[in-house]
Amino acid sequence: LDLSKFCQVPGGTAVRAALAEMRQSKTNVCLVTETNNLVGILTERDVLTKVATTPENLNIAVDEIMTANPITVTPDISAAEALWLMDDKQFRNLPVVDEKGKIIGSMTHQAVISFLAARYPVEVLNRPPRPDQFPRKQEGG
């Protein structure tokens, strides 16, 4: 599972600089740290809801608009548990930390879905709803 799609900035960084880092990293999440420990998460949703309508917020510190003390997971969480948690809490990103709170990466909903889809053979995904059903012509997607 790819956990590498994230950027990291120290607390106190301007929102504008964090957005530039997100753009350079080609990701939609930025983890905010203090002494290498996670203190918050800034997502594109935070930017859309708290900055897009108030452009002067580009110059404030990420600490003011980030989600502080975000829910985190450890690397041993199953893909099913991660998806359930993301669905239940309406998240698209889950920071992954070790037992000491050090950042390992960020788990995205897309990474989990891609991971699961890669493990199912194409034949299983394309089976007809009724196994005894035989199509008259070949269908496919």
Predicted segments, located by residue:
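Tandem CBS (Bateman) regulatory domains
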Residues: 1-5, 43-74, 78-88, 106-141
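Short, flexible active-site loop motifs that bind/organize anionic cofactors or intermediates
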Residues: 5-8, 37-38, 72, 102
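A glycine-centered beta-loop-beta connector
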Residues: 22-25, 30-46, 86, 94-110
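The conserved cystathionine-beta-synthase
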Residues: 8-26, 33, 72-90, 97, ...
